[in-house]
């Protein structure tokens, strides 16, 4: 450690020691349960699409911690910080605990707490009024998450089928469409990937370890423990890049150029499974002809990546086949060419 860094660190520690103890009381861990009755109930975390199973531990009816279910294949008994932090959301003083009705007050508007009966009567009355005056198909729904299914059934029973999922286009819609166009079906959610048993994993637009799901982080860790090769394509040196054997700091927005160059190398060097392609695919000749102009030297001008690095990583992927995974990613809506990028990944 350099002298300058040591002085800076010492100053930071000294400042921390000077903080009054009273200011740190809010940072203490939650108390352990007392002598009351503790009940453990199974639950499912609904914060993300992984829907990890767990248990809520409650003392005298008050939850005090959440733990993972060891029999759940999504979490393997371990929850992410959002899952274990669910108690914080439950105890949050700003959490809505009853319906609120928008009302006029003076020159503005505010929300007035109402009972569930009053809220449901108000909503039912407005829905009936709209149906009588304009028709039930004048009610639309913008939905997301697991709760959407319940409201969808209500909407259909009401007489409307006008529904949309804006998050589909903002998140994984291009991925689902790209894989459906290539394979005839989409990836699904959770993603149907066997990352744990892969010998080579390619992350291109997939920031696992920073913004993806608990189960995938565990699968990636298990794969690396088994000796898998990790290739990360990312303009920045991400957490995953720090774990990778190869980091490709690509120019933003040029992922398709790299994918085309990889295909060029794999096809022209006969690194693909020709028997599989002949038996199960259509249109391969058209793909082969299409990628001919897109060699690593061409991709270098687009992506800023060394042609030798492009060739090396393409050969690594081919050498590990069929246990090579190019991760499909999530939150894949970036530059307007996202469906085509996902088709290239597929």
Regions inferred by a protein language model and the residue ranges of each:
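Acidic/polar loop patches that form or flank catalytic/metal-binding clefts of enzymes
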Residues: 64, 273-274, 310-311, 324-326
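A generic alpha-helix surface/boundary motif
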Residues: 149, 293-294, 342
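A charged, amphipathic alpha-helical module
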Residues: 287-293, 297-312, 316-319
């Amino acid at each position: 450690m350099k002298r300058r860094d040591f002085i800076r660190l010492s100053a930071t520690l000294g400042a921390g020691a000077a903080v009054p103890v009273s200011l740190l009381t809010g940072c203490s861990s939650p108390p352990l349960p007392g002598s009351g009755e503790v009940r453990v109930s199974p639950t499912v975390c609904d914060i993300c699409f992984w829907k990890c199973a767990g248990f809520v531990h409650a003392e005298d009816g008050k939850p005090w911690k959440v733990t993972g279910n060891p029999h759940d294949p999504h979490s393997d008994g371990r929850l992410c910080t959002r899952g274990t932090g669910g108690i914080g959301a439950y105890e949050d003083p700003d959490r809505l605990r009853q319906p609120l009705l928008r009302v006029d007050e003076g020159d503005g508007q505010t929300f007035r707490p109402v009972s569930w009966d009053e809220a449901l009567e108000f909503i039912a009355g407005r829905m009936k009024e709209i149906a009588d005056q304009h028709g039930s198909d004048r009610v639309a729904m913008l939905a997301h998450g697991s709760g959407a299914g319940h409201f969808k059934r209500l909407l259909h029973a009401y007489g409307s089928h006008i529904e949309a999922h804006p998050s589909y286009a903002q998140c994984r819609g291009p991925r689902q469409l790209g894989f459906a166009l290539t394979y005839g079906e989409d990836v699904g959610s959770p993603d149907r990937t066997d990352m744990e048993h892969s010998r080579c994993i390619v992350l291109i637009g997939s920031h696992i370890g920073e913004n993806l799901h608990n189960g995938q982080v565990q699968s990636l860790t298990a794969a690396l423990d088994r000796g898998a090769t990790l290739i990360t394509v990312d303009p920045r040196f991400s957490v995953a890049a720090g774990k990778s054997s190869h980091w490709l700091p690509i120019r933003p927005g040029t992922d398709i150029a790299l994918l085309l160059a990889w295909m060029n190398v794999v096809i022209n060097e006969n690194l693909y499974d020709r028997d599989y392609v002949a038996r199960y695919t259509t249109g391969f000749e058209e793909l082969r002809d299409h990628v001919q102009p897109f060699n690593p030297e061409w991709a270098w001008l687009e992506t800023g990546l060394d042609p030798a690095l492009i060739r090396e990583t393409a050969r690594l992927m081919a050498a590990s086949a069929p246990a090579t995974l190019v991760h499909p990613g999530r939150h894949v809506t970036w530059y307007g060419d996202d469906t085509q990028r996902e088709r290239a990944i597929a």
